[in-house]
Amino acid sequence: MSLIVYFSSRSENTHRFVQRLGLPAVRIPLNEREHLRVDEPYILIVPSYGGGGTAGAVPRQAIRFLNDVHNRQLIRGVIAAGNRNFGDGWGRAGDVIAQKCAVPYLYRFELMGTPDDINTVRKGVSEFWQRQPQNV
């Protein structure tokens, strides 16, 4: 049990980060008409949009994915990408999703992340799943 579900825009920053993690992962489609349904618990990784406020921070595709009750019931945590140029609002999508889905905001990284971010997330995700009840 260690699935990563992620959304990445055409910039591919989040996609490159997830690829470097080397963990099992599925991507939420860019095309909003395509639907993804998952059948196991997962950690969601999303970029943050907008200027640091909550309105528009979460990508529409991620909202649509989480509006599926089945998918929403399986989220266990969130990691957000952002840009420090937005000050305190960087990585805001993680705050929004953590609050609305009642899951922990596990980590945030800037743009494509650094090698330290990759190592921290890889280790943190492994430890997170080890702490989860096996029947979830």
Swiss-Prot record:
One of its GO terms (biological process) is protein modification process. Pfam families: Flavodoxin_NdrI. GO terms for molecular function: FMN binding. Belongs to the NrdI family. Probably involved in ribonucleotide reductase function. This is Protein NrdI. It comes from Klebsiella pneumoniae subsp. pneumoniae (strain ATCC 700721 / MGH 78578). The gene is nrdI.
